[in-house]
Amino acid sequence: MPLWVFFVLLTLTSGSHCSLPPSPPFRVRRHADAIFTSSYRRILGQLYARKLLHEIMNRQQGERNQEQRSRFNRHLDRVWAEDKQMALESILQGFPRMKLSAEA
């Protein structure tokens, strides 16, 4: 058997080594799938980064708000204590008058 016939037979029988390239519609579909997948992953990455950024900003804003709330609450407590003290003093100042008016 001539050598070239042997190579032709070997080429035709071995489908894995010398397979034909995929048909164009299959390649186009694979290419479109790859474009979609890479774009989808990029968008998911951007959404994840945006979510992390919002969480960090909300955490910082929450700490600021908590600090402002505690300052505001301390101020309210101080004002309430002062009002309570003034009301108590005015009541106590009224007692001697009440005693004097009750005795008279």
From Swiss-Prot:
The keyword Transmembrane does not apply. Coiled coil: none annotated. Disulfide bonds: none annotated. Transmembrane segments: none annotated. It is found in: Secreted. GO terms for cellular component: axon terminus; extracellular space; perikaryon; terminal bouton. One of its GO terms (biological process) is response to hypoxia. GO terms for molecular function: growth hormone-releasing hormone activity; growth hormone-releasing hormone receptor binding; neuropeptide hormone activity; peptide hormone receptor binding. Keywords: Cleavage on pair of basic residues, Secreted, Signal. Pfam families: Hormone_2. Residues 1-19 form the signal peptide. It comes from the Eukaryota. Residues 20-30, 75-104 form a propeptide. Belongs to the glucagon family. GRF is released by the hypothalamus and acts on the adenohypophyse to stimulate the secretion of growth hormone. This is Somatoliberin. It comes from Rattus norvegicus (Rat).
